[in-house]
Amino acid sequence: MDGTNRNTGAEGLLGILCCGLERSAEQRTAIQLGDRSQYVGLSDIAQMLDCPRAALAGKLYTPEYRSTDEALKHKITFHRDHWFERGVHQSLIGYGLSPLSQLEIEIRYGDVPIKAHLDFTLVTDQPQPTVRILEVKSTARLPATLSESYAMQIGGQTALLKAYWNHPVFNIIQETGEVLYHRTLPESCQELLDVSLPDDASACDIQGWVLCLSMCDAKAFGPFLPEDMDVAQCLDMASEFWETGVTTDKPVS
């Protein structure tokens, strides 16, 4: 572009937006997800299904952009998930529900640290014990069928929730900023929601759902049941991902 025709004011505004989005993402990641170099997330395992090399590169290296425009496009796409999550949270609250946001399942599989972060968990004990996991995804266009990676992620969430139901591996950040660590799921729900869940997960109706949102439409996929996912396979994939990362020249980050 001819330098005499540059709109420096517009460029400056977009630069502020780009920098602000980056800082906001760093702060939110630190609060909600912690140091992602120290564990394997279910999203990492899901990305392995699409492209193992890209999934590992996304952990190992900070992306470099050729221009502010390129960086801004990437950051807006990344933030769209979080913007939609906020909108979905407001709609659930508006309907009268009390969702648990970003419930974390923190486990170890051998020497491999694994975490699952559930966008929304809806729980009730009336008329019967019920848990619904809702994963929110933003898409440019609504898919006709759910991708294998998304299905793996929600399947892993439901399977891990049931498998570790009565283990003290559930963490959640409250709106006050206080963090409840190392509760069982029934303990968390009793403490936060005053909902009584059985000690046996088999006595509870557990389903996972994926809500895909575009800029003007929405589509729900499900239900995904705990028994639809092979927990051992999921954990083995996490182990493979971790071992590949820690044997490279850089730590997973």
Question: Locations of the language-model features?
Answer:
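Metal-dependent nuclease catalytic cores that hydrolyze phosphodiester bonds in DNA/RNA
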Residues: 1-132, 152
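Amphipathic, positively biased hydrophobic alpha-helical segments used for protein targeting
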Residues: 62, 166-168, 249
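Mg2+/Mn2+-dependent nuclease catalytic core
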Residues: 97, 104-245
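Short, active-site-adjacent segments that bind or coordinate small-molecule cofactors and metal centers
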Residues: 251-253
